[in-house]
Amino acid sequence: MKFNDHHNLDGQHAFMGASKYHWINYDDEKLVDTWKNLQAIQRGTELHDFARRCIELRQKLPSRKKTLNMFVNDAIGFNMTPEQILYFSENCFGTADAICFRDNMLRIHDLKTGETKAHMEQLLVYASLFCLEYKQEPDKIEMELRIYQGNEIYVCNPDPIDIRKIGEKIVRFNKLIEKMKNEE
């Protein structure tokens, strides 16, 4: 049999694909909710890309108490780098939405476009990754972490001990993962 050619779909996954088979148990309401959630995730990705471009181009947005506007304008005002990967190993890295380190002050800002309440732990991990990658002692620098969500700004000045503990856990867990990989 000669199968139909669908090479244009290589690497893509359908919303109702076989590998995502859970949809066969959905009712109409669950399907609608799941679809809307997927669309919100895609919109969030597009908004992050838009924010990145605005920051790179230093294009401020109108001064309004809107999540995206506040995030972009603050990142530009603090001369931050958008979408910066913070790397410890292939087992542990992440992308900070906006970051800068100047005058011994680490700033990390995170844009949240969804409705699920964000948690500062993600930014604590970014701060730990920064300290590990750039060999900074958490107790020797100042840190301000911000989450922009729901037209609000949530600010945290983390305890350096917490950042150090997360960093130690990253190092320990990375060694454990590498040991398991070598045993395979």
Predicted features by range, described:
Residues 80, 174-175:
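Non-catalytic accessory segments flanking enzymatic or RNA/DNA-binding domains
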Residues 86-168:
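Nucleic-acid nuclease catalytic cores
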Residues 175-184:
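Accessory terminal regions of nucleic-acid processing enzymes
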